[in-house]
Amino acid sequence: MGQKVHPIGFRIGVTQTHRSQWFAKPKDYAKLVEEDLLIREFAESRLPDAGISRINISRQVDRIEIEFFTARPRALVGAKGETLTQLRDEIKAKLPDTRNVALYVTKTQQPEMEAICIAENIAEQLEKRTPFRRTMRQAIMRARKAGAEGIKIQISGRLNGAEIARHEWAREGRVPLHTIRADIDYATARAQTIYGILGIKVWVCKGEKSC
């Protein structure tokens, strides 16, 4: 059943941490979850070229701290920080309550091993009509060269414009989905092609962590 469980949610508290860290009263919980979702979706749609791999949100009484992990921090911050300041003001305007919003940016050291970066790069290549097998091979080669223990990529849809949709996958190294201590990163992406939407799934094994 390991393939039917979300690999990150399956490992929360062992090798993965919660992306949102805060406490709330039961009556406020749904509202704050909706706010978190709004912040994430807005930031990703506002800066699609920033290579954001993860967004962590923590809350205090009247303060929200948002940490962006990105492969291209300059695209997120701007030349003199004006892009980040503008993003903070726009997020603050979208929140229903007036609160202090603090943004932090952390550079992703190895984007070649980040599942979301790999998936989005594959989607970009497929939209440019690059052959899907070559795209998968190149992504696997880069991830393995960066130090990944294993990687699996699956692409689904009307591949090469075929009449019948199918899925194809490629794997190199070990990707143990049942091993909870395995540090598995997982992400999905979509490619809009002239034949329809292609779905991309990426699993990256970065090693094992002690429980």
Swiss-Prot record:
Primary residence: plastid
GO biological process per UniProt: translation
GO cellular-component term (any): cytosolic small ribosomal subunit
Alphabetized SUPFAM superfamilies for the sequence: Prokaryotic type KH domain (KH-domain type II), Ribosomal protein S3 C-terminal domain
UniProt KW keywords: Chloroplast, Plastid, Ribonucleoprotein, Ribosomal protein, RNA-binding, rRNA-binding
Record carries keyword Iron-sulfur: no
InterPro entries linked: KH_dom-like_a/b, KH_dom_type_2, KH_sf_prok-type, Ribosomal_S3_C_sf, Ribosomal_uS3_bac-typ, Ribosomal_uS3_C, Ribosomal_uS3_CS
The UniProt record lists the keyword Ribonucleoprotein: yes
PROSITE patterns reported in the protein's UniProt record: KH_TYPE_2, RIBOSOMAL_S3
Domain KH type-2, chain residue ranges per copy: 39-109
Disulfide links within the chain: none
Localisation per UniProt entry: Plastid, Chloroplast
MF annotations from Gene Ontology: rRNA binding; structural constituent of ribosome
Coiled-coil portions: none
PANTHER family assigned: 30S/40S RIBOSOMAL PROTEIN S3, SMALL RIBOSOMAL SUBUNIT PROTEIN US3C
Subunit structure: Part of the 30S ribosomal subunit.
UniProt family annotation: Belongs to the universal ribosomal protein uS3 family.
Protein name: Small ribosomal subunit protein uS3c
Source organism per UniProt: Ostreococcus tauri
